[in-house]
From Swiss-Prot:
Keywords: Ribonucleoprotein, Ribosomal protein, RNA-binding, rRNA-binding. The gene is rps4e. One of its GO terms (cellular component) is cytosolic small ribosomal subunit. It comes from Desulfurococcus amylolyticus (strain DSM 18924 / JCM 16383 / VKM B-2413 / 1221n) (Desulfurococcus kamchatkensis). It comes from the Archaea. This is Small ribosomal subunit protein eS4. GO terms for biological process: translation. Belongs to the eukaryotic ribosomal protein eS4 family.
Length: 252
């Protein structure tokens, strides 16, 4: 007998701890559909609309608003209330000129910060890996599931490939034009996307490479001069001289 696949249902008690839901009031909670972010690092659009933005009091109200096309993610209307929303996604409330970015925050892991219309025109995406495709072109695979193709004139000397794994692209949305690039190196500003220091912002002081990425340790220094460490896997570069995105007051 073949496998029946994963369950389409999720008990509230088993949902990621950072989801802002009333676990004792409801037995079941909406489960994210397959999409650009894993369930461990995202939350369903319905929970964002109802529990974080407060545009609905019930799941039924949230589903209706989403189905009517009132919410854009990264410049595109999303009508699937289970659509997974994750780090650096840009949310637009259609018709009211409100824009938000999902960022890592202390304790809550994922939070929203209101941004300007100008800032809502771009997104930061971390390069997770690179692959060589037909004709020697380079494909950059990003943290939110999207891919960017770098066209190469001479595969034997790919001078166009100036991007490294774990660096960050500043992309226009929804058209995906590369506007800027932040490499992963000492001296750049980064935000921590997970672990006990989630949401902290600092300048990278040193990178100690291990046998695996999760064993590599990065030391950062915050604006107050306090040093802290985290896994390389949690490092998300956000700027060289200054952050490219708006951050909570006091973060940097």
């Amino acid at each position: 007998m073949g496998s029946m696949g994963g369950s389409r249902h999720l008990k509230a008690i088993n949902a990621p701890r950072y989801w802002p839901i009333l676990r004792k009031e409801y037995r079941w909670v909406v489960k994210s559909s397959p999409g650009p972010h894993p369930i461990s690092r995202s939350l369903p659009l319905l929970i964002l609309v109802r529990d974080m933005l407060g545009y609905a009091k019930t799941g039924k109200e949230a589903r209706r608003l989403i189905a009517e096309g009132y919410f854009k993610i990264d410049g595109r209307v999303r009508r699937d209330y289970k659509f997974p929303v994750g780090v650096m996604d840009v949310i637009e409330i259609v018709g009211v000129n409100k824009y938000y970015r999902v960022i890592p925050v202390p304790t809550k892991v994922l939070g929203l910060i209101e941004i300007s219309r100008e800032e809502a025109s771009f997104k930061l995406c971390r390069i997770e890996n690179k692959t060589t495709v037909k004709n020697g072109h380079i494909q950059l695979n990003l943290h939110d599931g999207r891919n960017v193709l770098i066209r190469v004139n001479d595969p034997r000397n790919p001078v166009e490939d100036t991007y490294d794994t774990l660096g960050v692209l500043k992309l226009s949305i929804p058209v995906q034009q590369i506007l800027d690039y932040v490499p992963l190196k000492e001296g750049v500003i980064a935000i921590v996307s997970g672990g006990r220091n989630v949401g902290r912002v600092g300048k990278i002081v040193s990178i100690h490479k291990g046998m695996r990425r999760y064993r590599s340790i990065v030391t950062l220094e915050d604006k107050q001069g306090n040093k802290f460490q985290t896994s390389l896997d949690y490092i998300f570069p956000i700027g060289v001289e200054k952050p490219l995105i708006k951050l909570p007051e006091g973060a940097w």
